């Protein structure tokens, strides 16, 4: 490690990279722990501590120059962003999407079921009259596709998405794992809806 300590700019780069790795693992472990993935979180914590032992000792012993302190702080902030981005790409867990729509004639529940989603729907009443509320459980990796599908089917729908803490009972989780969700283009969705309306 002497060649690193002797070169000030190489030291800055080393501090920056090591802190990115360390904080990335730290952020991912925290998120995974909160989501209940305890064994994956434990595996990530092993890598986190490994980086800490191997690299952070070098980092902390060379924070005597302003450029090293800036590299440490900048690496810390970038590490948080990188960790969150990785977790977003992994898209672990499920999302519940609540949809409120006034378009009864579109038969959105069956349209979404035909696309492979599990839908529970019921009637509700708002300020401007009756509404249809749908509750949809989907893996997080399909959340964006589901949101885009709903917006294409009903651009005026009111949508809320959140992550459930616990899931128990029902066919939702197993059904979604087995079910292959269809991926239609916006033009295809419009033709499907028009065909459904004309057939009624």
Swiss-Prot record:
CDD domains recorded: YitT_C_like_1 (cd16381)
Primary location: membrane
Transmembrane segments: 8-28, 40-60, 66-86
Native source species: Staphylococcus aureus (strain USA300 / TCH1516)
Topology with respect to the bilayer: Multi-pass membrane protein
Keywords tagged on the record: Cell membrane, Membrane, Transmembrane, Transmembrane helix
Name this polypeptide is given: UPF0316 protein USA300HOU_1913
Cross-referenced HAMAP family: UPF0316
Annotated family: Belongs to the UPF0316 family.
